[in-house]
């Protein structure tokens, strides 16, 4: 908080270890804001005069789009959960009760078989606690034998998977794949130390975390270790490229909007500051160059064997397409099965619906080709 003239500033969340969203001040003397916490997104509040941060809403779900009545006695928001695509709810400001105002997807959901994820908590090699989820494959409970598994990695890296609805993950589960998704170090929702756990070294602690999740899944589920895939988009695409340079445990990979070379990416992507802050400097400084190179998958591409599909939008300014082209060429020149599908007039955060449909089918075909898991429908 600050005075209208900008003076008298007070940090109301100085002792709070999460990232507050956009603040809204209420007549009752509180500042309301939402934030992500351990895979969920909820509403919080703190007194204007200072005090403890209080969580207002609860549950294993993600809430967004909060709006408030003029007197702040009531609020409305959108809620989504792993088997609920999202609807609008209203509640008193205390959130003691809530009323569902819409059932936009009720008719569609009634026709679908949706799958409930199981929460996982496991330790990385250095003892760090990591959270993840396993979405069981269609027929897993009733069937015997081992199932193929796909490790899905989020973007960011300062993002968060959790208790929201994902069409892509549900589709993979419906096609017979176990779907593992985790929040490795650099994810939000677990405190500042965790959020900056990859600072200066992408591909190290985060890699250890996701692979610890893979080992945990193998120990606790019927996983066919010869039919495992790995995929991600943006930072998740980068981490996919990194994973295939570090291990041959995966039978196939799909790298979406992926980075392979942090030096060539510098100053051509639309967020150059990320490289300087995350890797300790620009490439013309020795320290920055050292960290940029050591975290670049292209530098470690010798010996990669994992068949990999690359998908990328041609006008992606966040992750320019030449980043994926470099990794594709590195694999192709080594005789590794690789395919590149590029989409015109498609940027980082938006594709036309039909291009999204095409990408979905291309990816399913790749998984079927290398993991051979699509069940008879």
Predicted regions and their residues:
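Multi-bladed beta-propeller domains
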Residues: 1-27, 35-36, 46-64, 92-117
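Conserved beta-strand positions that form and line the central face of beta-propeller blades
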Residues: 8-12, 42, 55-56, 100, ...
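Active-site-proximal cap/loop segments of hydrolase catalytic domains
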Residues: 181-377
């Amino acid at each position: 908080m600050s005075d209208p003239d900008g003076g008298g500033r007070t940090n109301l969340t100085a002792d709070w270890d999460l990232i507050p969203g956009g603040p809204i001040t209420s007549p009752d003397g509180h500042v309301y804001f939402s934030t992500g916490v351990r895979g969920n997104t909820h509403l919080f509040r703190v007194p204007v005069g200072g005090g403890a941060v209080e969580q207002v809403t609860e549950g294993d779900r993600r809430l967004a789009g909060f709006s408030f009545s003029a007197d702040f006695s009531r609020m409305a928001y959108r809620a989504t959960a792993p088997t609920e695509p999202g609807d609008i709810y209203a509640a008193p400001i205390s959130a003691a009760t809530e009323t569902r105002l819409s059932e936009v997807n009720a008719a569609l959901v009634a026709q679908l078989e949706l799958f409930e994820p199981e929460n996982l908590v496991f330790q990385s090699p250095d003892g760090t606690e990591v959270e993840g989820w396993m979405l069981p494959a269609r027929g897993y409970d009733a069937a015997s034998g081992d199932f193929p598994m796909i490790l899905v990695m989020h973007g960011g890296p300062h993002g968060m998977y959790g208790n929201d609805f994902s069409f892509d993950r549900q589709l993979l589960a419906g096609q017979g794949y176990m779907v593992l998704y985790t929040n490795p170090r650099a994810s939000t929702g677990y405190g500042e130390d965790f959020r900056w756990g990859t600072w200066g070294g992408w591909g190290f602690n985060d890699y250890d975390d996701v692979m610890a999740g893979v080992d945990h899944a193998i120990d606790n589920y019927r996983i066919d270790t010869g039919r495992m895939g790995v995929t991600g988009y943006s930072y998740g695409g980068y981490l996919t490229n990194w994973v295939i340079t570090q291990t041959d445990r995966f039978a196939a990979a799909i790298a979406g909007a992926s980075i392979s070379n942090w030096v060539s990416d510098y100053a051509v992507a639309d967020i150059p500051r990320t490289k300087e802050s995350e890797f300790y400097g620009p490439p013309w400084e020795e320290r920055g160059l050292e960290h940029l190179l050591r975290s670049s998958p292209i530098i470690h591409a010798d010996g990669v064997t994992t068949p990999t599909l690359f998908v990328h939008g041609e006008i992606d300014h966040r992750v320019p397409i030449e980043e994926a082209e470099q990794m594709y060429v590195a694999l192709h020149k080594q005789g590794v099965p690789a395919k590149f599908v590029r989409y015109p007039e498609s940027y980082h955060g938006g594709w036309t619906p039909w291009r999204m449909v095409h990408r979905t089918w291309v990816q399913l075909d790749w998984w079927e080709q290398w993991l051979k898991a699509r069940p008879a429908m």
